[in-house]
């Protein structure tokens, strides 16, 4: 297993309302999948040495910005970066709307219609992960699957359930 990965992730959701059961389930699955397999590296910046991973990541929203607080396993500060939430707003909103449709569809619609909604949901999810990768460019290197799982967690934080 590579050292350039996330070994622990925490969401600072202390100022958020409790999540719905569906959102809590999405969160648990995303965290489990993320910790099982991910790729997360901090590129060298300027002339500073970058502490090697694995990393502990704390995700939070402060002053309308998404904050990645990254530490080594020994809890030594490795990096911190703040991303504007603006570029995420529409895709997060679209993702939650399609998820709501999906959760409702699962209860009442035939599999063929559920599959159509699920394909749209995956497409929006892919768009969100692409936006995240763009926003992290030069700050952190992540693969597509890691971006997808982190995007799910950003959605949980962004809308607070």
Curated annotation (Swiss-Prot):
This is UPF0262 protein SPOA0072. Belongs to the UPF0262 family. Residues 1-21 are annotated as: Disordered. NCBIfam families: PRK02853.1 (NF002769). Keywords: Plasmid. The keyword Transmembrane does not apply. InterPro entries: UCP032146. It holds the Pfam family UPF0262.
